[in-house]
Every structure is written in C-alpha cells, then in structure tokens.
Amino acid sequence: MRKSLIFIGLLFFGLFAKAQEMPLMRPIPDHSFAHFERNHLVFPGDNTAMERFFAKMDSVIFLGQGNVSIMHIGGSHVQAGSFTQQFRDNLFSISDELMGGSYFVFPFTAGKTNNPSHFMVSYTGEWEYCRNAVSRPTDKRMGLAGAAVTTTDPEASISIVTRERYPSDLQPEYTFNKVTVLGFSETENVVPVVHCDSVTIPGLYDEWLSTYTFQLPDFTDSVCIGFDSVAGEFTLTGVLLDNGMTGVSVHGVGVNGASVPSYLRCDDFERDLDLIRPDLIIFGIGINDAAEKNFEKETFKQNYGELISIMQRVNPDCALLFMTNNDSFKRIKKKKYEVNPNGKIVQQAFMEMAEDYGAAVWDQFDVMGGLRSMQNWEKAGLAQKDKIHFTRDGYKLIGDLLYNALIESYMQHVRQNAKQ
C-alpha cells in the first residue's frame, strides 16, 4: 500500500509542479442558471486550520502514513447518502488505497426510515426509533448518529453490508475485521453479539464509552448483530466498522429534519465523536434552522458556536468547512410555494462564522445560482418538487462540486509547497 500511495503522491507532485490541467477534477455539466465558475472554497479569515488538514493529507498521499478523518454532518441531505457517497467515491477514485480504516454507520432501516445509499441494512424483530429532530418524553439517549433504535425482541438482529445501493464505477470495495457497537441496556441484562458465518462472537465491553468491540476472524463486507438474552431491552446508537488500514475515512452523519439544536440535544455526542476524531468537519446543517418562522441569525450563530465548541474539545486542531444552504422554497398551500429568503441570511452568517473560527466556506447557495435558483434545478431534473431536496442526479452533482472545490484548494496547497 505504501509504495502505491507514494506513486500517487509523485503523480500529484508532477502534475502540480507543471501547473497542468487538473485531471483529478470531476467533469461538471454546463447549466446557464448556475455559477459553477465560482465553485471554490472561500476563506474569509485565517486558513491555518485547513493548511494543517492538508498537511495530514500530504502525509497519507506522499508518505503512505497516518490517518485522516472527515465528517460530513447535516440533515436529510446527508441521511439520503447520495451526496456524501459521491464526495467519498470521488476522493477514493484518486486511488482506492487512499481509503482509510474506519466507517461510522447507523441502521436507519431498522427504524423504518430511509437508509443512506452507501451501505445496506436489513433487520429482524421489532425496533422502536427515535431521532434528534423530534423531542418526545420516551426518547432514548442519543449520540453522534443523532438517532437510536431500541428492541425488547429476543429474535431481533441487524445486518449491515458495506455495498452501495447504486453501485458505480467509482465505488471502492470496503471490508473490515473489527466492529464496535455503540449502545446500552437500561435493563442491564442484554448484551450484543456478532454472528459471523456459524460462529457467535462475544464483544469486549467498555463501560466508559458504552461500546462493545468485536474482533472478527477474517475481513468481510457484512456483519450481523444479535443479542444473547431472551428478555430485556437494548438501545443501539451507532456502529463503527474498522480494518486497521491507514488512509482517509469519510463519515456521513445526518438525520431527517435535524437542525443545529437537534445535535446539541444528543447527550453522548461528544463522547462518541472522539471515536472518529475528525480532522475535517463539513457542516451541512442549516436548511431546517432557516425554515423556522422566527429564524434569527444571531441565535443560529450562537447555536453553531456551542456545536463547534464540542468539536474543538474533541480535536482542537480540526479544520472546519461551512456549506451555505441550498436555495429553497416554502409550501404555503397545495402546489403553491414561495422562496425562503433566509438562504441569504444564512449565507452571511456562515461567512461571519468562517472569519471568526478560521474556517472555509463552500458557498453552495451562490454556486447553484442564488435566490430562486432551486426552480431551475427542478426544471433540469436536479431538484425534487418540494424545492428543498435534490434528486439523486442533483445530489451527485453537488457531491462533485464539493469535491472539486476541496481538491482544487488542496492542489493549490501542494503546488505552493512544491515551490519551496
């Protein structure tokens, strides 16, 4: 692996030193209503944190050493999976040997809601689901995933397969030999186990982290999680897969309807975040905040400040990348919509926060065409009729755009360092 990555590093160096056309960029279709020529990362303030992240990327690409962890966090745009999947697949299309060891997932299918497209889940038994976007007295404690599934069914199980629902030529193969189940039993008599072929594997319990870790006998792309008790209750709040490889890991964390306060309500968020310890956090939260009738920019920034404080306690050196909201509309009556003007306010808020926190901004709002542009995306088959969400093709396109903006900035970093 190391030799292959060093070869990729030399390829990077040669291309950048000669300032040739950048072949690692994804092709972007021409749409006159969009501003794709402005698809760049913007740094309203200091870029030291991003340079630090790029230096870690250098270590992986040029030396074949170390690990880089990227987390993309948001709402339904992230839970759908296609956006993060496209960004992730683009990154690993440079070389599948860039793929790092860890992979955080949540089995949404067991909660009878849509599962991200970049892995598949099946289940047996009865499960109860709760999510951070809806507050109920019966909700269980939640962590990084922003969701939880609970069962009292002794026959319950969850199976996870790391294959994409919509395979593409870019899709890398991911296998693992270590599984960490995040969760707890309030009745204290239910313990998860892993079924691998005909063997039942017990886990190593960490009381502080509330995790059960299972070492598998071989590398695999699938796992079945069951339980060793005939009675009681267990709540699962996430699953971390790992294979011990060096490289880049990309984690998608998204819950339908989630706003910034949604994640602040998750009691175990900070504790769980330390399991993946991101070096780059891509913030895609904001579309649901901006949909509120009494949306206020300063409250939005204050909430984000609390969330960023959590992130920085886990990793003070992590780089932050804010995504401005996509343009969106509100339904005021059946088949009648009006544009949500808060998109411009959120755009300004992110620019201000980026200056305050030394973060980057990917100005999705501007790149897609600005206010009312979602109508054009819908006409082009890239956005859904609700004028909030994208179609699968639309999510793939914004995944390409985000990837291009980040890799362009990284290429500039490499080129500048090549001159030194």
Predicted features and spans:
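Conserved, compact domain cores that house catalytic/ligand-binding motifs in diverse enzymes
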Residues: 66-72, 79, 83, 245-337, ...
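Conserved SGNH/GDSL esterase-like catalytic core that processes O-acyl groups on lipids
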Residues: 79-195, 204-302, 389
